């Protein structure tokens, strides 16, 4: 059996993934970082992009798109705290474009500071998802 580690992916909306993985590849601020069981402790910021999860007994990697956040690595536990995150399978491009345009339109109007902050998060989420769909299309999905 391959060595494994625990991974928790959490966004402001809640837990997205919690389980055992063989490896994680994430878009860190200084470039992609590959994490395997026994990795040295690490704390880094994440850039927007795809996080690839290798799950035991699954033929294909699972992909989670993040808009940024933090990554904490311990030898056998990885915690990914994302501003916004979504699984690859949940992306629907048409809905995402509509959400993006709605958030942009509302941001142009005068709104309270709280509403503005919420809309910025929604816009970042929509942009991340649209980028994810575009990457999937380039990969032939």
Curated annotation (Swiss-Prot):
Q: Disulfide bonds, which pairs?
A: none
Domain of life where this protein originates: Bacteria
Any idea which UniProt keywords this protein has? ATP synthesis, Cell inner membrane, Cell membrane, CF(1), Hydrogen ion transport, Ion transport, Membrane, Transport
- According to its record, how does it sit in the membrane? Peripheral membrane protein
The main location class comes to: membrane
Where is this chain's protein located in or outside the cell? Cell inner membrane
Q: Recall the GO molecular function terms of this protein's record.
A: ATP binding; proton-transporting ATP synthase activity, rotational mechanism
What would be one Gene Ontology cellular-component term for the protein? plasma membrane
Describe the task this protein carries out: Produces ATP from ADP in the presence of a proton gradient across the membrane.
Q: Which PANTHER family match?
A: ATP SYNTHASE DELTA/EPSILON CHAIN, ATP SYNTHASE EPSILON CHAIN, CHLOROPLASTIC
Q: Give the protein family.
A: Belongs to the ATPase epsilon chain family.
| Subunit composition and interactions | F-type ATPases have 2 components, CF(1) - the catalytic core - and CF(0) - the membrane proton channel. CF(1) has five subunits: alpha(3), beta(3), gamma(1), delta(1), epsilon(1). CF(0) has three main subunits: a, b and c.
Q: What name is this protein filed under?
A: ATP synthase epsilon chain 1
């Amino acid at each position: 059996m391959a060595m494994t580690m625990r991974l928790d992916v959490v966004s402001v909306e809640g837990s997205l993934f919690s389980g055992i993985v063989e490896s994680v590849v994430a878009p860190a601020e200084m470039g992609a970082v590959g994490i395997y069981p026994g990795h040295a402790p690490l704390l880094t910021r994440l850039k927007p992009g795809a996080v690839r999860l290798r799950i035991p007994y699954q033929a294909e990697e699972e992909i989670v798109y993040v808009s940024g956040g933090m990554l904490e690595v311990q030898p056998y536990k990885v915690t990914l705290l994302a501003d916004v995150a979504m699984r690859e399978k949940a992306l629907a491009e048409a809905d995402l474009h509509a959400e993006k345009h709605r958030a942009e339109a509302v941001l142009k109007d005068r709104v309270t500071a709280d509403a503005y902050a919420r809309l910025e998060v929604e816009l970042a989420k929509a942009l991340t998802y649209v980028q994810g769909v575009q990457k999937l299309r380039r990969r032939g999905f």
